[in-house]
């Protein structure tokens, strides 16, 4: 498994689900959304990857921490809560080619202001075990 396979797997999970496609309209991005992107949208970010080794320091697998941030420009979190719930439902305990397991860890909320405009996010954090 290469590092990019986890990226591709995660992106595929979020873009091939019918409910998420309807809610996000395909607006799932790696690291940053393009300027002028419509909301709501999801941004995937690799926070860190740590090698898990045996006693002989042979690589057994990698433990990758990923954040999925669902952003809105609406005045409340209400419209993105079902999206966050669906992402958690899809990813928690999921596996696939090169992905041994995915575990939901935590979430947080965040708000940013840019001029008069407010943006809100629900950020989900997952541990993805890859090999």
Predicted regions and their residues:
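Charge-dense, low-complexity intrinsically disordered segments
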Residues: 1, 74, 78, 113-116
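Acidic-leaning, charged glycine-interspersed low-complexity segments
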Residues: 16, 89-131
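Small/polar-rich, solvent-exposed N-terminal microdomains that initiate assembly or binding
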Residues: 1-58, 78, 85, 89, ...
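Short, amphipathic alpha-helical segments
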Residues: 78-81, 120
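Oligomerization/assembly interface segments of phage tail-like spikes and tubes
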Residues: 59-74, 120-131
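Solvent-exposed, well-ordered amphipathic alpha-helical segments
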Residues: 44-46, 62, 104-108
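Short, solvent-exposed beta-strand/turn "edge" segments of beta-rich domains on protein surfaces
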Residues: 55-61, 113-117
């Amino acid at each position: 498994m290469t590092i990019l396979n986890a990226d591709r797997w995660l992106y595929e999970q979020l873009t091939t689900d019918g409910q998420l496609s309807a809610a996000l309209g395909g607006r799932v991005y790696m690291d940053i959304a393009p300027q002028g992107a419509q909301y709501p949208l999801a941004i995937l970010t690799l926070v860190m990857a740590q090698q898990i080794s045996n006693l002989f320091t042979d690589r057994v697998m990698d433990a990758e921490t990923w954040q999925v941030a669902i952003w809105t420009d609406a005045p409340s979190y209400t419209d993105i809560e079902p999206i966050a719930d669906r992402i958690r439902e899809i990813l928690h305990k999921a596996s696939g080619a090169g992905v041994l397991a995915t575990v939901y860890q935590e979430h947080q909320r965040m708000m940013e202001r840019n001029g008069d405009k407010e943006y809100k996010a629900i950020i989900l954090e997952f541990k993805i075990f890859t090999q």
